[in-house]
C-alpha cells in the first residue's frame, strides 16, 4: 500500500477539503525530474506523520482542472491545507525541514 493518496477531481473534496487532518498536496507529473526527486521524501513524511497529516498527490497531466483551480504553473508545487482551507504553499524542490515546519504550523493552527 502506498503511503500517499492519489487525488483526482472526484475525491479532492472528500480527501482534502473535508479531511479532519491537515493535508499536504503534491502537484506533480511523471515527466518532471524535480518531482521524482521529491517523491521519496514525501513518502517518508507520509509514513512518519501517519494519523497526524495526510500526504496526497495530484498528477497535473491527469487532473488539469485541479491544477488550474489552484493556479499551478510550476511543478512540483506543494499546497498545505487545514480545515478545508489553503494555508501555505511551496514551489520547487524544498528540503524536509521546510516541509515539516510548514506542516507543524498548520497543524498547530487547526
Predicted segments, located by residue:
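Short pre-active-site segment immediately N-terminal to redox-active cysteine/selenocysteine motifs
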Residues: 20-21, 28-31, 74
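Structural microenvironment flanking redox-active thiols in thiol-disulfide oxidoreductases
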Residues: 58-67
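Conserved redox-active cysteine motifs that mediate thiol-disulfide chemistry
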Residues: 27-41
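A short beta-strand-turn-helix
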Residues: 4-23
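Conserved helix-turn-beta segment immediately C-terminal to the redox Cys motif
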Residues: 20-22, 39-58
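Non-catalytic, surface beta->alpha helical segment in thiol-disulfide oxidoreductase systems
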Residues: 79-110
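Conserved Rossmann-like nucleotide-binding pocket used by diverse enzymes
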Residues: 3, 8, 28, 54-56
Amino acid at each position: 500500500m502506498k503511503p500517499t493518496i492519489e487525488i483526482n477531481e472526484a475525491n479532492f473534496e472528500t480527501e482534502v477539503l473535508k479531511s479532519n487532518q491537515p493535508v499536504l498536496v503534491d502537484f506533480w507529473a511523471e515527466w518532471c525530474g524535480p518531482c521524482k526527486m521529491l517523491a521519496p521524501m514525501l513518502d517518508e513524511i507520509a509514513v512518519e506523520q501517519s494519523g497526524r497529516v495526510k500526504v496526497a498527490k495530484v498528477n497535473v497531466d491527469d487532473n488539469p482542472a485541479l491544477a488550474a483551480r489552484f493556479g499551478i504553473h510550476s511543478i512540483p508545487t506543494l499546497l498545505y491545507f487545514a480545515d478545508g482551507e489553503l494555508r501555505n504553499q511551496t514551489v520547487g524542490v524544498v528540503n524536509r525541514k521546510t516541509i515539516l515546519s510548514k506542516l507543524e504550523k498548520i497543524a498547530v493552527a487547526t
